[in-house]
Amino acid sequence: MLMPKKNRIAIYELLFKEGVMVAKKDVHMPKHPELADKNVPNLHVMKAMQSLKSRGYVKEQFAWRHFYWYLTNEGIQYLRDYLHLPPEIVPATLRRSRPETGRPRPKGPEGERPARFTRGEADRDTYRRSAVPPGADKKAEAGAGSATEFQFRGGFGRGRGQPPQ
């Protein structure tokens, strides 16, 4: 599809920076939400990504009316060459997440945190303890119950059925 080079470059830059691209399956959407400041239509994003997919530079997933594209290693190399980027710059999906360097958490008595029950856990534990009294036989209680005589009465309106005996 013919599209302005500035739109293609804006799409490729965002894809390389994030490592992923998401687009709603709507060809009539006037602007892609992440590229609204550059005035890029959603159709251009979909077609540029379709082109990259056909060359094997992105993997495509589709769910709930949204396309999800993930860069492959070949796609990273292609975009690096196309956008003239140095090898030190990598997409956000390949960067290591640094552990949080917040303040140290205070320790409780004996260096451990006290055990806390939320409402759901406490209810669940009491239910499990009181469900079967100690010494009761679960297998004797399982089964059809107290009804010892069964009656089978035809098949829910299919056919005439048998007369009662």
Curated annotation (Swiss-Prot):
Residues 90-165 are annotated as: Disordered. The modification Omega-N-methylarginine is found at R153. GO terms for molecular function: structural constituent of ribosome; tRNA binding. It is found in: Cytoplasm; Nucleus, Nucleolus. GO terms for biological process: cytoplasmic translation; ribosomal small subunit assembly; translation at postsynapse; translation at presynapse. Residues 97-128 have a biased composition (Basic and acidic residues). The gene is Rps10. GO terms for cellular component: cytoplasm; cytosol; cytosolic small ribosomal subunit; nucleolus; postsynapse; presynapse; ribosome; synapse. Its main location: cytoplasm. Component of the small ribosomal subunit. The methylated form interacts with NPM1. Residues 154-165 have a biased composition (Gly residues). Keywords: Cytoplasm, Isopeptide bond, Methylation, Nucleus, Phosphoprotein, Ribonucleoprotein, Ribosomal protein, Ubl conjugation. The modification Phosphotyrosine is found at Y12. The modification Phosphoserine is found at S146. There is a cross-link at K138, K139 (Glycyl lysine isopeptide (Lys-Gly) (interchain with G-Cter in ubiquitin)). Methylated by PRMT5. Methylation is necessary for its interaction with NPS1, its localization in the granular component (GC) region of the nucleolus, for the proper assembly of ribosomes, protein synthesis and optimal cell proliferation. Monoubiquitinated by ZNF598 when a ribosome has stalled during translation of poly(A) sequences, leading to preclude synthesis of a long poly-lysine tail and initiate the ribosome quality control (RQC) pathway to degrade the potentially detrimental aberrant nascent polypeptide. Deubiquitinated by OTUD3 and USP21, antagonizing ZNF598 activity. Deubiquitinated by OTUD1, antagonizing ZNF598 activity and stimulating formation of polysomes: deubiquitination by OTUD1 promotes stability and translation of a subset mRNAs with a high abundance of rare codons can limit the translation rate. Signal peptide: none annotated. InterPro entries: Plectin_eS10_N, Ribosomal_eS10, WH-like_DNA-bd_sf. Component of the 40S ribosomal subunit. The ribosome is a large ribonucleoprotein complex responsible for the synthesis of proteins in the cell. The modification Symmetric dimethylarginine is found at R158, R160. This is Small ribosomal subunit protein eS10. The keyword Lipoprotein does not apply. Belongs to the eukaryotic ribosomal protein eS10 family.
